[in-house]
Amino acid sequence: MGNSKSGALSKEILEELQLNTKFTEEELSAWYQSFLKECPSGRITRQEFESIYSKFFPDSDPKAYAQHVFRSFDANSDGTLDFKEYVIALHMTTAGKPTQKLEWAFSLYDVDGNGTISKNEVLEIVMAIFKMIKPEDVKLLPDDENTPEKRAEKIWAFFGKKEDDKLTEEEFIEGTLANKEILRLIQFEPQKVKERIKEKKQ
């Protein structure tokens, strides 16, 4: 997508990313340098993305979640992300606008990409989220959501869906915007992600 491999980020991409994210020119330029160090080709594979993501969460297992995040941002399904896709992924998972984040969250939960979400897909993502929560934090969760199965059940019940029903993107976004409890249940705590990213930038 027009990324320069010479070590400088093209003006067009820099301006576009500043427009679409909250990141500053300095942050983006610094990230681009470290991105090129990790990925000299200017593209990042799923394995490389998992490796970078795991550095944000050294005391948990984010591999499964990172795979789903990667899938949701690999727009052309070529198995790689360029710098622009990578930064948008970071932005959307931490600081995007509510509706943008929910559109992304829908694509995250729509594991097979068929345009609807099933209860099994909810469970698959929730299981990936649970691998990122420290065991001592899991113990602090309420009894009706302290396992992936219970949390998936609770999410599905909030949407008023039967076992084999499907959830459309519109239902997902409207239901989540109308109920903060659903929003809390469907995501890994974004504040923790933000804190980890800030630590890495320092």
From Swiss-Prot:
Keywords recorded for this protein, A-Z: Calcium, Cell projection, Disulfide bond, Lipoprotein, Membrane, Metal-binding, Myristate, Oxidation, Redox-active center, Repeat, Sensory transduction, Vision
Disruption of the gene: reported phenotype: Knockout mice exhibit reduced scotopic vision acuity, however do not show rod photoreceptor degeneration. Rod photoreceptors have a higher visual response threshold resulting in a 4-fold enhancement in sensitivity to low light intensity, with no change in pupil size. Dark adapted rod photoreceptors have a reduced recovery time following stimulus, a reduced adaption time to background light and sustained photoreceptor signaling response following stimulus. Rod photoreceptors have an increased sensitivity to stimulus in saturating background conditions.
Protein name, entry field: Recoverin
Expression (tissue specificity): Expressed in rod photoreceptors in the retina (at protein level).
Assembly description: Homodimer; disulfide-linked. Homodimerization is caused by prolonged intense illumination. May form a complex composed of RHO, GRK1 and RCVRN in a Ca(2+)-dependent manner; RCVRN prevents the interaction between GRK1 and RHO. Interacts (via C-terminus) with GRK1 (via N-terminus); the interaction is Ca(2+)-dependent.
Modification note: The N-terminal glycine is linked to one of four different types of acyl groups. The most abundant is myristoleate (14:1), but 14:0, 14:2, and 12:0 acyl residues are also present. The Ca(2+) induced exposure of the myristoyl group, known as the calcium-myristoyl switch, promotes RCVRN binding to the photoreceptor cell membranes only when intracellular Ca(2+) concentration is high.
UniProt site (Interaction with GRK1): K192
Binding of Ca(2+) 1, residues: D74, N76, D78, T80, E85
Gene: Rcvrn
Molecular functions per Gene Ontology: calcium ion binding
Covalent lipid sites (N-myristoyl glycine): G2
Organism whose genome encodes this protein: Mus musculus (Mouse)
Binding of Ca(2+) 2, residues: D110, D112, N114, T116, E121
Localisation: Photoreceptor inner segment; Cell projection, Cilium, Photoreceptor outer segment; Photoreceptor outer segment membrane; Perikaryon
Record note on domains: EF-hand 2 and EF-hand 3 domains are the low-affinity and the high-affinity calcium binding sites, respectively. EF-hand 1 and EF-hand 4 domains do not bind calcium due to substitutions that disrupt their respective Ca(2+) binding loops. The cooperative binding of calcium to the EF-hand 2 domain following EF-hand 3 domain calcium binding requires myristoylation. Calcium binding to the 2 EF-hand domains induces exposure of the myristoyl group through a protein conformation change, this process known as the calcium-myristoyl switch facilitates binding to photoreceptor cell membranes.
Membrane topology: Lipid-anchor
Domain (EF-hand) ranges: 41-59, 61-96, 97-132, 147-182
Record-listed Cysteine sulfenic acid (-SOH) modification sites: C39
Record-level GO BP terms: phototransduction; regulation of calcium ion transport; visual perception
Pfam families according to UniProt: EF-hand_5, EF-hand_7
GO cellular component annotations of the record: dendrite; membrane; perikaryon; photoreceptor inner segment; photoreceptor outer segment
Region of interest (Interaction with GRK1), residue spans: 189-192
Gene3D superfamilies named among the record's database cross-references: EF-hand
